Every structure is written in C-alpha cells, then in structure tokens.
C-alpha cells in the first residue's frame, strides 16, 4: 500500500485531460458580460444589451454564445475588420443611432451564414461598403444615412438584401444630379433613372475633351511647322536674290571648225 494521502491514477478525484478542455470551453462560452451591459441568458443563448452606454468602440469581451447584440444609441464611429468574428451564433446585430462613418471590408467576417438582421440605420454612412455587406444574407437597414447617390451605390444595392420595411426611407442626401437630392433612392431608381449612365456620360465627355485637346495641339504644331518652313524658304529665296549675278560676255561666238 502506498503512502497515506497519495491518490492512484484511477482515482475519481483526479481530473482527466478531456475534462480540463471542457472546463476551458465552458469558460469561453460564459465569458464575462461587457462592463455596463446586461447579458440575460435564455437556455444557453445570450442576449447582450449595451444600448445607450456611451460606447465609442465595439466591446471585445462579448460572450461567444451571443445571439442578440444591441449596440444602438452609442457613439461608435467605426466598425473595424473582424469585430464580430468570434460570435458564430449571432443572429441579430443592432448598430443603429450611432456615428458610424467607416466600415472595414472584413468587419462582418464570420457572420455571413448565420446573421439574420443587421441594423445600420441612423448613422453617418455616405458610401455603402460593398465588400463588407455584399456577402451577408441578412436583412439590412440603411435608412437615415447621408448617402451620396452615385453609380457605386446603385451597383452595391443590387447585391444587398434590404429590409423591406425600411427601404423606402433610404434617401439621397447628396447626388451629382441635384434633382435627386432628398428623394427616396428606390423611387429614383424605379423611375428609370440611372446614376451609372450619368457616370458613363461624364466619362465620355471627359474623353472627348481630352481628345479635342490633343487634336488642337496637333493642328497647332502642323500650322507652326508649315509657317516655319515658309519663312525659311522666303529667307533662302531672298538670300539667292542678293547674290551678285555673273557678267554676260558680249563677244560674238566663233564658228565651230
């Protein structure tokens, strides 16, 4: 018998390696709730409520089993790349009523398949980040943003699944065509207008102006070249006229024998 107090390897009190991994996994799932937020747990699914907390950036200590994340009514100005990549179970993300101006191209990486609703309304977004939103299958709310209506916006909208309940509230805050400013974007597009055709016309005009400029330069060079040659020819002729002529002999020619 071994010394008193030593436990055999088969003792039930000795934790196995597998149980250690299980404990670590559970700790990861049960990560602490972000400071000043509320994280009610419903049957293992966590809803994180961080509304109106004065947050300036997205919290990093969000539980991995979060299914609902409310970050609305804060002061968040940007969404960096990979901000939610550790939240594979996230189904609804509310970022409305913030000051978001910039969204990284990989800001929503890891959410493409599971996310069902993304609320970006009431922010400061001027241009739609096509790379960030184009791969999402979630319904997206973009109303009440100072959008600049242009060809890139029109092309991006074709790839997004916009929320039908708020799509009529997406308006042109600015536009290259003044008649569309302040009008609902869907109404403008349904009328047959196209920001891309305007973009192509602008490009064509710029190309024509450039070609006309080159043509004018070529014509000016040809005119200069001709006039320069004419001036040289005139000077050469005057020089020849100024040369003394050879005296003409007045003696009669002798007959050839």
From Swiss-Prot:
Xref: InterPro entries: Leu-rich_rpt, Leu-rich_rpt_typical-subtyp, LRR_dom_sf, LRR_TM_domain-containing, LRRNT
Cell compartment(s), UniProt: Membrane
A single GO cellular-component term on record: plasma membrane
Spans traversing the lipid bilayer: 205-225
Cleaved signal peptide residues: 1-32
Domain LRRCT: 145-198
Keywords: Leucine-rich repeat, Membrane, Repeat, Signal, Transmembrane, Transmembrane helix
Protein name per Swiss-Prot or TrEMBL: Leucine-rich repeat-containing protein 3
Organism, as annotated: Rattus norvegicus (Rat)
Family membership noted in the UniProt record: Belongs to the LRRC3 family.
Domain LRRNT: residue ranges: 33-64
Record's bilayer topology term: Single-pass membrane protein
Sequence ranges of the LRR repeats: 65-86, 89-110, 114-135
């Amino acid at each position: 018998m071994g010394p008193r107090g030593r436990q055999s390897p088969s003792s039930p009190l000795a934790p196995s390696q597998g149980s250690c991994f299980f404990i670590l996994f559970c700790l990861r799932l049960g990560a602490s709730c972000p400071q000043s937020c509320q994280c009610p747990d419903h049957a293992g699914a966590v809803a994180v409520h961080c509304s109106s907390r004065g947050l300036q950036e997205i919290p990093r200590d969000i539980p991995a089993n979060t299914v609902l994340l409310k970050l609305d009514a804060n002061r968040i100005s940007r969404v960096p790349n990979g901000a939610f990549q550790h939240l594979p179970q996230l189904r609804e993300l509310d970022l409305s009523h913030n000051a978001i101006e910039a969204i990284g191209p990989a800001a929503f990486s890891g959410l493409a398949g599971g996310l069902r609703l993304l609320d970006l309304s009431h922010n400061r977004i001027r241009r739609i980040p096509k790379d960030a939103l184009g791969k999402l299958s979630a319904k997206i709310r973009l109303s009440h943003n100072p959008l600049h209506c242009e060809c890139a916006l029109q092309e991006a909208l074709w790839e997004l699944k916009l929320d039908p309940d708020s799509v009529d509230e997406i308006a042109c805050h600015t536009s290259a065509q003044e008649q569309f400013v302040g009008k609902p974007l869907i109404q403008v597009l349904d009328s047959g207008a196209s920001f891309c055709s305007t973009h192509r016309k602008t490009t064509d005009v710029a190309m024509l102006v450039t070609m006309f400029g080159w043509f004018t330069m070529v014509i000016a060079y040809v005119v200069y070249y001709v006039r320069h040659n004419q001036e040289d020819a005139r000077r050469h002729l005057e020089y020849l006229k100024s040369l003394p002529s050879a005296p003409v002999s007045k003696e009669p020619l002798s007959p050839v024998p």
